Amino acid sequence: MTTNTFTDPPVEMAKERGKTQFTVRDVTNFLNGGEEETQIVEKIMSSIERDPVLSVTADYDCNLQQARKQTMERVAALSPYLVTDTEKLSLWRAQLHGMVDMSTRTRLSIHNNLFIGSIRGSGTPEQFKYWVKKGAVAVKQFYGCFAMTELGHGSNLKGLETTATYDQDSDQFIINTPHIGATKWWIGGAAHTSTHCVCFAKLIVHGKDYGTRNFVVPLRNVHDHSLKVGVSIGDIGKKMGRDGVDNGWIQFTNVRIPRQNMLMRYAKVSDTGVVTKPALDQLTYGALIRGRVSMIADSFHVSKRFLTIALRYACVRRQFGTSGDTKETKIIDYPYHQRRLLPLLAYCYAMKMGADEAQKTWIETTDRILALNPNDPAQKNDLEKAVTDTKELFAASAGMKAFTTWGCAKIIDECRQACGGHGYSGYNGFGQGYADWVVQCTWEGDNNVLCLSMGRGLVQSALQILAGKHVGASIQYVGDKSKISQNGQGTPREQLLSPEFLVEAFRTASRNNILRTTDKYQELVKTLNPDQAFEELSQQRFQCARIHTRQHLISSFYARIATAKDDIKPHLLKLANLFALWSIEEDTGIFLRENILTPGDIDLINSLVDELCVAVRDQVIGLTDAFGLSDFFINAPIGSYDGNVYEKYFAKVNQQNPATNPRPPYYESTLKPFLFREEEDDEICDLDE
Amino acid sequence: MNPNNTGTIEINGKEYNTFTEPPVAMAQERAKTSFPVREMTYFLDGGEKNTLKNEQIMEEIERDPLFNNDNYYDLNKEQIRELTMERVAKLSLFVRDQPEDDIKKRFALIGIADMGTYTRLGVHYGLFFGAVRGTGTAEQFGHWISKGAGDLRKFYGCFSMTELGHGSNLAGLETTAIYDEETDEFIINTPHIAATKWWIGGAAHTATHTVVFARLIVKGKDYGVKTFVVQLRNINDHSLKVGISIGDIGKKMGRDGIDNGWIQFTNVRIPRQNLLMKYTKVDREGNVTQPPLAQLTYGSLITGRVSMASDSHQVGKRFITIALRYACIRRQFSTTPGQPETKIIDYPYHQRRLLPLLAYVYALKMTADEVGALFSRTMLKMDDLKPDDKAGLNEVVSDVKELFSVSAGLKAFSTWACADVIDKTRQACGGHGYSGYNGFGQAYADWVVQCTWEGDNNILTLSAGRALIQSAVALRKGEPVGNAVSYLKRYKDLANAKLNGRSLTDPKVLVEAWEVAAGNIINRATDQYEKLIGEGLNADQAFEVLSQQRFQAAKVHTRRHLIAAFFSRIDTEAGEAIKQPLLNLALLFALWSIEEDSGLFLREGFLEPKDIDTVTELVNKYCTTVREEVIGYTDAFNLSDYFINAPIGCYDGDAYRHYFQKVNEQNPARDPRPPYYASTLKPFLFREEEDDDICELDEE
């Protein structure tokens, strides 16, 4: 059969798919955590895909106004699940739907996770019941938002300036915005939707400042959506992405709320103005971890979508010829194209392993904390243990959140570039995907700040280890002796492909960095206070967090492969090796500097990365099919399952832009007058001198 | 009122809060500048004369109501397409009678404020017009001028190269131009949907004519891809010519103002004279004459690359200015209890995120200027060439070849660098970087196509890497090579060079360090290349095997070029008052580049592990030094608030006031109910779920 550029792609795709050497379903099950989970996932995906309100076919052409309205309709369509879904189902649904519609996911999550999460996490059980009765869980005559950030202050809770002053006479708090810089800003759901908010404000009782606490403040009258007295709200307007989310600003001018609207699970204020502080303050921040943990999973889901598009396209797109061929070469067959995409495919798999581990730890820890009463002295030991675990999870999730959200942004961007011009088309989703995604690198803790705080945590853990004290499992390796002794003769090939060696190489690199930074820290604190010393070591803290997190992803990947079925194990191992070796290649300075590897090893690693790319290349369709995404979730014609990319892409462009009139809408008003203009000559004064 | 209120800041005995402090802080920061800002601007612009000309043009743009950008970020695609057309119409008036250099300046400055208009006019003047001038004969050029191509009357051109199934690989294009000897015409045809011309800027709405790239087929023989002028629309009513189909490409990641379209040709007939015949000629009898040197036809592609390097600087400077001004007034977290929050510019890590990028933006300018000047000289030489001057021709061909590879690497790494600058500066502004009104989102979306068009950056880099290896091969054979790679001649010295206790703040040592890194990578790749050829591979196959090495070679070589050009420009042009501040930037750039790629220097043995610690300390040191002058360095870019178009980056530092005002101007707070309250929100909040009916029949 002869084919041309237009008809060749689906034929090629079928051939590529035929190269798969493993049972795709086994990898899908491995990724999802078993056949049972896969079935749950598929059920949720089809409930999304079949709902006409959730159809994303025309999404790329929506303007801001259309996107806002449509997102509200989708929130309404998804709201019944808020009541019926278990926690697990709810997470799956949000993550799966978030892959194709990040705005709806966020707009719903503002209420469901941030608002409800705060009431549940920081309110007493009675308070939680009260707000449930008002309609908070069912979302009836009620929509909540989360008023934390201020115009002049981001995630630094201590710096917030909104005040909640206790007025004992009326037994009320007075919520106030002292100046424009303290306006609540970026508040998702505020501009259009919310009736209530959880407001972060400084608790002031009898003139004393007790720090930032949470208060429920009604924003709008429920029956007509008009603003409550003293509440001013505006629309934040155009953002880089997530147009569907109605972010707004809020100012409070002496708004009075009952004392009981302060969320009192931890700090309490009595009707006589007596303030009781919790035994363990850290626990109030546990809720922030939920966001981080789910962003790690989101990084995986969004990455897998764009990698599938770029790799499918690479398998059917031809560009340039190498000598002798009549047809141009498929771009997937260029070694450099493989190097651009295949390590990222491996990275994406690694994210999933890291995400699952973090989610498991988080669920266990939260369940334990919610079962404890912070004010019961008998539970002190259990509480302290829970606090240690939370702290460790807090630090670990910081680095994972930062590097996976960055990793995902890089993947969207690199995949777009790998699709050449068609990656720039609105209809292949990369532009919107990137614009919607990247806020994840900023919100709920700016990635750089998170990394620095994690680096600080790592140095503190190292100090614990040096003092012979107990640290959590994920950091214990810092206290071990390195099993690698480089004698300058180089490392044999088998070693460079062995999981044990690669994990140990990363641990050695990470350990040396952390310990060297700890040495410097101990030197500096002789003359500086700890904060100053840590500031001096900013670059080092960042590097520690970066290498430790990479080490963590690599070791989790290998650990999880141990549980995989035999037929898929070799393929997963190739991916994991590719990820580890490529990571070394990207960071050769560290491994040379720590004398873990020799210059000769680096050359060998370069060729091993080439070899592994070639080995993985034939399996790319299988490895991406295993993500189990239908064309609905792909939402990019050049990434469609059947590979019939040009036909689908051409059809999509023409559906969205029917070619009816060769004249633009502004032909009469602008274009014609321009093309047919007669310039008036400058008059020349005719008078002779 | 409250001693713990971290919003209370005292400056010179007066109290300010988060909202009122920023302009005062900005004035303090500005006062720290130790060098004459104006002199720095002259240095960047290449002299006072250029600065004055730029200022005149900027004022003309800024004062023109048509170029008012107050609403810019809220325009939807339809609105921005129309506005862009109006702006193109206005700009075309300047193109007619101004010196070419001023036109270039105007385009470059417009490009900072509005990339869509820049491109949409560029589609005609850069691409269509450039192609007719560059590949048409003088008579042909005169003909199209007489039709209105020169001043855009009853005429608008576009450039139909890319096809749906084929990008920048000219050899793969499938549109055909078959010569019909009987009628003395070419028949232009699109053989199947994948050969549809795609991404054609100006096609969907504007263009009357196009230059189309099609395979020249005469008497059944395929002579490869040539360029033809084809009329697309009837002039009088803008309807399509017979055989032409055009559609709108619709939504793109960015550059909404450009009407990219697709074009299909169904046996469209054009006169033989519409083939642009400066190089390839077809006569009445169907005799085809091919040019002696294909390389000469590529000259016009270099123009685009050189101007993209310069655009990278222009756009980069806008965003680094915004982020650094904001960093000087934004406070976040407190390092000392009881004290106000710290300005984010004072965090060492924030300095490391932004200051090397500031240095990078400066470096881009030096290299873009240098390559631009080389390009102009070469083009002049080419124009002056006598037909029988063999030696002169060889020299020009060798210059063009070198420019081709130098500009490839420079285009790739400078457009990537600019994308990185926009992205990192956005993140450095935290949440406010994500606001539409501070410009990052739109600029990123508009910018990044530069990394793809006119040669995908990865492909360009690989081809630059190929040229580097070819130069090394030539050197080994004793053949002459161009200036840009002349350092490779010192191969043997470079192979074993070490720092040996020399100072890492000596420009000569730093340039040498990069020559060592680049030279060894190139030479090692060349060894491998020669080995593969020896094993029987052909050149293409050997180069494919060495893809990663080619990429690295081009990357390191280009960085070396940027560093060397920066130091050399300081040496030759900087006056005493600005020399040290410039050296501080150049040293920061060179040292940070080493830190980012420390593996290279350890691997070659030029540096030892302890030297890497020194490099890190020096980067910290230069960050601290440069930090004091950031307002001076960015003021020197000389951008008014119009060109900045981001309230958090405005000159006076009154960021929160301007930003709050902008948001409210664009989104007046009138109705707390959204437009869809009655249709969607209210029915949702007040819904009553219907209970499922339960069948009440009792079982018997």
UniProtKB/Swiss-Prot annotation, chain A:
Family: Belongs to the acyl-CoA oxidase family.
Binding sites annotated in the UniProt record for FAD: 149, 188
Pathway field: Lipid metabolism; peroxisomal fatty acid beta-oxidation
Gene: POX1
Any one of the GO BP annotations: fatty acid beta-oxidation using acyl-CoA oxidase
Lineage, opening ranks: Eukaryota, Fungi, Dikarya, Ascomycota, Saccharomycotina
Keywords: FAD, Fatty acid metabolism, Flavoprotein, Lipid metabolism, Oxidoreductase, Peroxisome
Catalytic activity as recorded in UniProt: a 2,3-saturated acyl-CoA + O2 = a (2E)-enoyl-CoA + H2O2
Organism: Yarrowia lipolytica (strain CLIB 122 / E 150) (Yeast)
Superkingdom, taxonomy of origin: Eukaryota
Cellular component terms (Gene Ontology): peroxisome
GO molecular function: acyl-CoA oxidase activity; FAD binding; fatty acid binding; flavin adenine dinucleotide binding
SUPFAM superfamilies assigned to the protein according to its UniProt record, in alphabetical order: Acyl-CoA dehydrogenase C-terminal domain-like, Acyl-CoA dehydrogenase NM domain-like
Co-factor(s): FAD
Protein name (Swiss-Prot/TrEMBL): Acyl-coenzyme A oxidase 1
Location relative to the cell: Peroxisome
EC number: 1.3.3.6
Catalytic residues as annotated in Swiss-Prot or TrEMBL: 444 (proton acceptor)
Signal sequence residues: none
Assembly information from the UniProt record: Heteropentamer composed of five different subunits.
Curated annotation (Swiss-Prot), chain B:
GO molecular function, one term: fatty acid binding
GO terms of biological process kind: fatty acid beta-oxidation using acyl-CoA oxidase
Catalytic reaction equation(s): a 2,3-saturated acyl-CoA + O2 = a (2E)-enoyl-CoA + H2O2
Protein name per Swiss-Prot or TrEMBL: Acyl-coenzyme A oxidase 2
Cross-referenced InterPro entries: ACOX_C_alpha1 (IPR055060), Acyl-CoA_ox_N (IPR029320), Acyl-CoA_Oxase/DH_mid-dom (IPR006091), Acyl-CoA_Oxase/DH_mid-dom_sf (IPR046373), Acyl-CoA_oxidase (IPR012258), Acyl-CoA_oxidase_C (IPR002655), AcylCo_DH-like_C (IPR036250), AcylCoA_DH/ox_N_sf (IPR037069)
Primary location class: other
GO annotation, cellular component aspect: peroxisome
Biological source species: Yarrowia lipolytica (strain CLIB 122 / E 150) (Yeast)
